[in-house]
């Protein structure tokens, strides 16, 4: 699997979504300001090529340190560093593949990570290691010297993470608006206290899926298609993860899919449509998201982790959506709204 990030985006997408601003000139101006702020925020926070190259160098050094004990292994970058949603502050997630078969994450993965931990104890660039026992155990590694600002989370044989990274990379590159929208939604969720897996709220990956689902099913017309349905061979679960390549361009879209590109909706319209969709149209008690199926599914049909009370999660969407359209103290509300989204600072 190549580790080069696809930077070319398709400038194609959907028309106006369900969030309809007031028709006044003042409301339209506010929408323009918000779109510009979102673009600036993404530009300032987006992971740079230089940062990615440093992560690639660190990955290579770790591979050369680990490969003597696992000669046939592969070491893959996964997560936000590669899928297009990385920021300047993103950690480096790595997946060590030692076999094509699944392993027991509760026992075998811990044994492998313990071996890696012992091997890296004498490595000159390693400052600290911590083995974290979870559903998918990880070895957290901190460094000194050149890579002191990068933290690595290493897992073993979590092939799902490689497949998800491959899929998310193509979604993030399909339309230029996807990345800035995801970035500002993550920051908004963090400011509202609902982007912290340690507190049983949304993980960053869950928020990415929520944005993609909205762009597939909530925006009218849709901004994103169902890529797994459109390109079943490319995203087949049977594909060998070692052959996945995030730099290959898409084949022409099959005419049978009937997909049409539109580029009418602004970032602000899509953001407010996202808030409106989860505030008023998505039932957190009954609905779940399926990116693979490209639709909402019954929540009872899928396993769900315990999360914050649904009314607390829903309240953040409702409050943010209503605040933007409040007619009282428009200038103050606009500034507060942008601040809570994370696109301005006091």
What are these regions (language model features)?
Residues 35, 52-59, 63, 91, ...:
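Generic preference for well-ordered alpha-helical elements
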Residues 1-89, 100-111, 129:
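N-terminal regions immediately upstream of nucleotidyltransferase
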Residues 163-203:
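Basic, alpha-helical interaction scaffolds
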Residues 110-162, 180, 190-191, 195-198:
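Conserved catalytic core of two-metal-ion nucleotidyltransferases
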Residues 32-46, 74, 89-100, 156-166, ...:
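Surface-exposed beta-strand-to-loop junctions
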Residues 62, 66, 70, 74-82, ...:
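Residues that form ligand- and interface-recognition hot spots within folded domains
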Residues 75-85, 112, 129-138, 198-206, ...:
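Short amphipathic alpha-helical segments embedded in low-complexity Lys/Glu-rich regions
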Residues 31, 37-41, 213-346:
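Pol beta-like nucleotidyltransferase catalytic core
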């Amino acid at each position: 699997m190549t580790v080069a990030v696809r930077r070319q985006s398709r400038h194609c997408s959907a028309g106006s979504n369900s969030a309809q601003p007031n028709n006044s000139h003042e409301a339209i101006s506010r929408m323009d300001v918000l779109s510009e702020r979102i673009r600036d925020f993404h530009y300032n926070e987006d992971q740079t090529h230089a940062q990615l190259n440093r992560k690639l160098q660190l990955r290579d050094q770790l591979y050369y340190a680990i490969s003597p004990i696992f000669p046939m292994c592969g070491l893959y970058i996964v997560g936000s560093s590669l899928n297009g949603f990385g920021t300047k502050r993103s950690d480096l997630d790595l997946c060590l593949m030692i076999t094509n078969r699944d392993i027991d994450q509760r026992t075998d993965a811990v044994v492998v990570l313990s071996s890696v931990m012992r091997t890296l104890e004498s490595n000159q660039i390693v400052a600290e290691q911590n083995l974290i026992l979870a559903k998918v155990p990880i070895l957290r590694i901190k460094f000194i010297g050149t890579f002191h600002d990068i933290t690595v989370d290493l897992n073993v044989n979590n092939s799902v993470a490689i497949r998800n990274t491959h899929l998310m990379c193509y979604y993030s590159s399909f339309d230029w608006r996807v990345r800035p929208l995801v970035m500002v939604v993550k920051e908004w969720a963090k400011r509202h206290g609902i982007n912290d897996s340690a507190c049983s709220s949304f993980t960053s990956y869950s928020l990415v899926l929520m944005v993609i689902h909205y762009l597939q099913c909530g925006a009218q017309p849709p901004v994103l298609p169902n890529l797994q349905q459109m390109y079943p061979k490319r995203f087949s679960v049977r594909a060998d993860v070692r052959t996945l390549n995030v730099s290959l361009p898409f084949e022409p879209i099959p005419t049978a899919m009937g997909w049409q590109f539109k580029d009418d909706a602004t970032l602000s319209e899509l953001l407010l449509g996202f808030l409106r969709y989860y505030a008023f149209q998505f039932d957190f008690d009954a609905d779940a998201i399926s990116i693979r199926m490209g639709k909402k599914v019954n929540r009872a049909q899928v396993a769900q982790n315990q999360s914050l009370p649904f009314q607390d999660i829903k309240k953040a969407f409702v409050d943010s959506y209503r605040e933007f359209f409040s007619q009282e103290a428009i200038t103050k509300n606009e500034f507060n709204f942008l601040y809570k989204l994370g696109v301005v600072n006091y």
